[in-house]
């Protein structure tokens, strides 16, 4: 069976406001299975934003694990992310999961990968998924050359990615923390 794949998840931070959004397309091979999936969530009583890319079932498994790590570490984003990455790298079952997470709270944005990487973007812009580089490039240009809010930057950048990446559509879910 072919793997579900392809999406665009983008996070932009400006000042004390962060926005995280994603498109809604789910593909199986070369078929669009759904166009309105929610790949972005608020967790931990609305204090943390999470977006996921990769295999759908794998991503939900990781999302559940991440939420339990947040609870265990009282919402400390970095600690929960590092602990999830450790488990992901060392647990035989988790090691096979093909997904990535983009997480953010009021202070930090992190990309968590299946290789055990926990990466904090330098410029407050993080992106994952097949259209991530398109969205990240657009967001960087908009952040450096406009006064748009993070919400507006995410929306415009996801639209640009959707026009360029065949695995990304124009149906967006965007959440913010301010």
Swiss-Prot record:
EC number(s): the record gives 3.4.25.2
User: How is the protein's activity regulated, according to its record?
Assistant: Allosterically activated by HslU binding.
Spell out the Pfam families in the cross-references.
Proteasome (PF00227)
Q: What is the role of the protein in this entry?
A: Protease subunit of a proteasome-like degradation complex believed to be a general protein degrading machinery.
Q: Which PANTHER family match?
A: ATP-DEPENDENT PROTEASE SUBUNIT HSLV, METALLOPROTEASE TLDD
Q: Which family, according to UniProt?
A: Belongs to the peptidase T1B family. HslV subfamily.
Known HAMAP family for this protein? HslV
Query: What NCBIfam families would the database entry show?
Result: ATP_dep_HslV (TIGR03692), PRK05456.1 (NF003964)
Q: Which reaction does it catalyse?
A: ATP-dependent cleavage of peptide bonds with broad specificity
Kindly give the InterPro entries that the UniProt entry links to this protein. ATP-dep_Prtase_HsIV_su, Ntn_hydrolases_N, Proteasome_sua/b, Proteasome_suB-type
Q: Which CDD domains match?
A: protease_HslV (cd01913)
Keywords annotated in UniProt? Allosteric enzyme, Cytoplasm, Hydrolase, Metal-binding, Protease, Sodium, Threonine protease
Assembly, per entry? A double ring-shaped homohexamer of HslV is capped on each side by a ring-shaped HslU homohexamer. The assembly of the HslU/HslV complex is dependent on binding of ATP.
Q: Which GO terms describe its cellular component?
A: HslUV protease complex; proteasome core complex
Q: Does the keyword Protease apply?
A: yes
Fetch the SUPFAM superfamilies from UniProt. Answer: N-terminal nucleophile aminohydrolases (Ntn hydrolases)
Q: Where is the active site?
A: 7
Q: Where is the signal peptide?
A: none
Q: Which GO terms describe its biological process?
A: proteolysis involved in protein catabolic process
Its protein name is ATP-dependent protease subunit HslV
Q: One GO MF term, please?
A: threonine-type endopeptidase activity
- Binding residues annotated for Na(+), in chain numbering: 162, 165, 168
**Location of this chain's protein in the cell:** Cytoplasm
